[in-house]
């Protein structure tokens, strides 16, 4: 196989929990991935998009001067043609690949539409069993348990709440427990034909989530855990090395995540690249911000890698710490929910300030689609706050400013040459400067 066809097959004030390290990725295309889940084994953005492989600290595959004649873009297109030439080669990180239908409850592969929602057999059976048995559950925690394929059995209460939240219909379950063909749903009677019915049935307090929000929720990557190098003594080098590795691994997931945004794969390959190259740091910082919401004046760079002000000062990250903390406080004040967080990530990507957009009309359509989805969500879930969508959108300029500070800081770290950087992170830095 030619190189062009290659593809993706922390001390003071911080603490490291003894958690398992973050998996490299669930995608088969990461077969050439390094064990740590970083991007150096096959090259950075080039690995994801099919470019020539290089090791750590080698010259970047592209500069930030534009996309014309960009070898990264050429390899991106090679990736799309290679999948047509050889069906055995799966370019899983090709951004215009069509994602499989996922269960909106747990993220497993959906077997079809059950009770009005794309869902897997396990969640379908769980919902049916709960309704037929009239079972009531209670959450031992705070009714906010994460429901994934691996953890869907850990909390039945939160799993059932998730079923209802994504739109599963109770009336779709046969209460007589009789097996048979599909149940026929009759159209609801008009109120004038059945005034009694209109008096007895009241609308639910909250409507099911919009499809776009549901898709974004199930597309969220697994939780991220730090992997501090054991052979580096405690200090600024170890902290920066850990953060650079975390960023590199998150970028790998980010490329996969982007193709699950409805409408994103309709853009040209060049525009997909432009948006990612422009907005990646904003998306990463949003992740840090959301993880940090439960803490007081601390930043959660990963689930198990948390820095306070003193540690940030010792490792030279005090200015960046204060900038990100400003965002954390702003989102805390807004009491941002996870549904809003995933929408903001998608909007940050679509609202990129890239100068190299080929089809502005198509990008504008994507922006309009996501803006409308946010508005619909806020109207259905937060109707008592009619200006909430606007307040959330007004946080994006501060997010962009903070991302610019982060890029400049890590680029200066790169120029010093003391901290190793994996290919993907290195190349994305080059694209932003």
Swiss-Prot record:
Write down the DNA-binding region ranges.
100-186
Question: What GO molecular function annotations does the UniProt record carry, in alphabetical order?
Answer: cis-regulatory region sequence-specific DNA binding; DNA-binding transcription activator activity, RNA polymerase II-specific; DNA-binding transcription factor activity; DNA-binding transcription factor activity, RNA polymerase II-specific; estrogen response element binding; nuclear receptor activity; nuclear steroid receptor activity; RNA polymerase II cis-regulatory region sequence-specific DNA binding
| Principal subcellular localisation of the protein | nucleus
Q: Where is this site: Important for stabilizing DNA-binding?
A: 185
Question: Would you indicate the residue range of the signal peptide?
Answer: none
Localization in the cell = Nucleus; Cytoplasm; Chromosome
Q: Which GO terms describe its biological process?
A: cell dedifferentiation; cell population proliferation; embryonic placenta development; in utero embryonic development; inner ear development; morula formation; negative regulation of DNA-templated transcription; negative regulation of stem cell differentiation
Superkingdom per UniProt: Eukaryota
* Boundaries of every NR LBD domain copy: 208-432
Q: Which UniProt keywords apply?
A: Acetylation, Chromosome, Cytoplasm, DNA-binding, Metal-binding, Nucleus, Receptor, Transcription, Transcription regulation, Zinc, Zinc-finger
> What does the annotation say about its assembly with partners?
Binds DNA as a monomer. Interacts with NR0B1; represses ESRRB activity at the GATA6 promoter. Interacts with NANOG; reciprocally modulates their transcriptional activities and activates POU5F1 expression. Interacts with NCOA3; mediates the interaction between ESRRB and RNA polymerase II complexes and allows NCOA3 corecruitment to ESRRB, KLF4, NANOG, and SOX2 enhancer regions to trigger ESRRB-dependent gene activation involved in self-renewal and pluripotency. Interacts with KDM1A; co-occupes the core set of ESRRB targets including ELF5 and EOMES.
Record's function text = Transcription factor that binds a canonical ESRRB recognition (ERRE) sequence 5'TCAAGGTCA-3' localized on promoter and enhancer of targets genes regulating their expression or their transcription activity. Plays a role, in a LIF independent manner, in maintainance of self-renewal and pluripotency of embryonic and trophoblast stem cells through different signaling pathways including FGF signaling pathway and Wnt signaling pathways. Involved in morula development (2-16 cells embryos) by acting as a regulator at the 8-cell stage.
Q: Which family does it belong to?
A: Belongs to the nuclear hormone receptor family. NR3 subfamily.
User: What is the protein's name according to its record?
Assistant: Steroid hormone receptor ERR2
